[in-house]
Amino acid sequence: MISKLKPQFMFLPKKHILSYCRKDVLNLFEQKFYYTSKRKESNNMKNESLLRLINYNRYYNKIDSNNYYNGGKILSNDRQYIYSPLCEYKKKINDISSYVSVPFKINIRNLGTSNFVNNKKDVLDNDYIYENIKKEKSKHKKIIFLLFVSLFGLYGFFESYNPEFFLYDIFLKFCLKYIDGEICHDLFLLLGKYNILPYDTSNDSIYACTNIKHLDFINPFGVAAGFDKNGVCIDSILKLGFSFIEIGTITPRGQTGNAKPRIFRDVESRSIINSCGFNNMGCDKVTENLILFRKRQEEDKLLSKHIVGVSIGKNKDTVNIVDDLKYCINKIGRYADYIAINVSSPNTPGLRDNQEAGKLKNIILSVKEEIDNLEKNNIMNDESTYNEDNKIVEKKNNFNKNNSHMMKDAKDNFLWFNTTKKKPLVFVKLAPDLNQEQKKEIADVLLETNIDGMIISNTTTQINDIKSFENKKGGVSGAKLKDISTKFICEMYNYTNKQIPIIASGGIFSGLDALEKIEAGASVCQLYSCLVFNGMKSAVQIKRELNHLLYQRGYYNLKEAIGRKHSKS
């Protein structure tokens, strides 16, 4: 009596098995069902199981209970699908071993013959169905996998242009943990050389822009010297969100620097020690790279307002530093927006001796005089230099044919082939390891020579509390340099009577770090270690944080914050 039976538990009706056992109705088996079974152990009934099908078919109450068929036969120990045309869905047996040891299959000897079954071949074979379903499922898995990979690849492609893409952070952590510092650095430059780096498309805040004389910075953040020594990927680095970059330090002749390994990182303290020693390709080749950048800058609107400075120094075996500096200025001076004199690197023997007041005064005056001569003598109209410059550019980009208009524009702008179309400013980079008397003497020299600005500071050699840097020589930069640099900025800001602009460098990792430097007296900031430890998102994040802090502390613009620490005290 069907009404007395629980609708969930029914046996398979024989007549319906016969009616659906045809090969041409395979599509009808895409129906759903629940399967339950319980093993019935008996001495006389080995290898038999009681199959219970949970049926939700709307026709179940119309079936005669006398036609229910329970003839099952145990065939093998493989897990299979069990199909029923009476059910509305299908399900794979998850743990068949707890119910039956083998799957169910129709026993044709119990079915007998009928109009619907002519021979054994006409009976639907469960093994055949299982194999087909397995193939279909594998195809579906492949399609789903390919669809997932395609969607993720499409997402990654568009997000790869975002400096804050999360995969960059994962890759950065891997590099910091397993790859040598200089190899990581070279890999970054290689990506930048072929324009594979992301770029910042956000608009810089008008309240965070600043200037140093005729240098207008669209935001106060740039890249310090030493990151792109040879100017191979200036545009790619600037597009990360920086307003300026300082290439170099360059020397008249190329040199390999000190022995490797020479760059070591301490992730825990976010500090770097390096003993590179002015490794660069030489002034001539760097000049070629800078000329090519200036060409791209004229064609790319994203780069039209970005500043490029050049740090210059002396070769390791040079006795008179002034000769090397003059050579570099004559070669690259007309393409630079500012010239930074590096007399403070700890990795070139005897270089820091040039910070002595008398020597420093002579160096600054010689450099300023040489820059003035570039304008007075009209060097770009000198035939020999003009031809020489054309030969340099011809090596890479057929300069004479395609860029004649560029040369004409340069002549119309006093031959300064740079962003400002004016002669470059002169900055000097100082070491933090100076006593108070030396700092005061240097401040007097800077005021006397009317220098355009000072970069504070270079790396320090007076940090010895980092365990991983024990027995390693070189200059330390990063978070350990932050407080030393900030204190140095405060002192020089007061010693120069707030008259000489300051470019802050050393230990800047966040907007708060940058604002501390600015309130101490800095006009703009340079980043290096931040790029190493924070990656490509450095500029985007630090600009956002600084804008928020300026608003939070009630500054109308960044210029109001410069030196505010001194007015508060």
UniProtKB/Swiss-Prot annotation:
Keywords: Flavoprotein, FMN, Membrane, Mitochondrion, Mitochondrion inner membrane, Oxidoreductase, Pyrimidine biosynthesis, Transit peptide, Transmembrane, Transmembrane helix. Belongs to the dihydroorotate dehydrogenase family. Type 2 subfamily. This is Dihydroorotate dehydrogenase (quinone), mitochondrial. The keyword Transit peptide applies. It catalyses: (S)-dihydroorotate + a quinone = orotate + a quinol. It holds the Pfam family DHO_dh. The active site is at S345 (nucleophile). It comes from the Eukaryota. The chain crosses the membrane at residues 143-163. InterPro entries: Aldolase_TIM, DHO_dehydrogenase, Dihydroorotate_DH_2, Dihydroorotate_DH_cat, Dihydroorotate_DH_CS. Binds 1 FMN per subunit. One of its GO terms (molecular function) is dihydroorotate dehydrogenase (quinone) activity. Catalyzes the conversion of dihydroorotate to orotate with quinone as electron acceptor. GO terms for biological process: 'de novo' pyrimidine nucleobase biosynthetic process; 'de novo' UMP biosynthetic process; pyrimidine ribonucleotide biosynthetic process. It is a single-pass membrane protein. FMN binds at residues 225-229, 249, 342, 429, 477-478, 505-507, 528-529.
